[in-house]
């Protein structure tokens, strides 16, 4: 009896997972995330230099963050621009330095362009959650401004805290000496999960369950890590872009990677938004209904040939 119950439980689990995959597939097609990812990639490339300029300006305002600017740059370029980070870093740093020397009107223009990216992310995620409630202009501007001002500060604080923790004598002991490289190696992954989790929890105007957002963030972070490795391998082993575009190869490589990154983020958002729809479905709440329906359909399919034979006889 226990074996039968376990078999039935595993069977229902696989059926539920398969039904959720079908539900997620229909959602991905309906939301046209490839088009949304393309729009976000375009806005991101337009806003990339202003966002980095604003971030570095915010970090420069706090003396405690002066020594970690290089660490933040290396983290961003190595993690978010795989294989194209070296050449892209030179161009982007030059653009940022030129932008930081602008006038007051130019700085305001940079802020407006940076806010455009946050606004595009806001609209894309709320469309995925099918939310009809809209934030007021004051609330939206306050949230965007908070992201621009507090985001770099939180990023810098996390790096400072991490540097302090790993420098403690506790990690220099022989028992924990092997733990330090393991933690440092997984910091980008944890940073990615935390960032995507915060994105899924804060941006939608409706309430998002923490476990659903965490699951979507973990899946997106894993896909992001796998995509980063696969994309870096493709760029290094099959340098077709460099053969075609030459010195301008950084531009299409950067655009393709930004597009893939937004595809991954939107897939994680679709998983997060689809989970409550699927789990709150009355048909899925009863664990026996899915299995019963499948069994009934199978019995009907098996009985149809027999009925046909009886009719012929």
Curated annotation (Swiss-Prot):
- A Pfam family matched in the record: Virul_fac_BrkB
> What membrane topology does the UniProt entry give?
Multi-pass membrane protein
Q: Which InterPro entries match?
A: UPF0761_bac, Virul_fac_BrkB
The main location is: membrane
Provide the alphabetized UniProt keywords: Cell inner membrane, Cell membrane, Membrane, Transmembrane, Transmembrane helix
Q: Which residues cross the membrane?
A: 45-65, 102-122, 136-156, 183-203, 207-227, 247-267
Q: Which domain of life is it from?
A: Bacteria
Q: Which GO terms describe its cellular component?
A: plasma membrane
Where found, per UniProt?
A: Cell inner membrane
Chain spans, region Disordered: 290-313
The family this protein is said to belong to: Belongs to the UPF0761 family.
Q: State the name under which the record lists this protein.
A: UPF0761 membrane protein Sden_3448
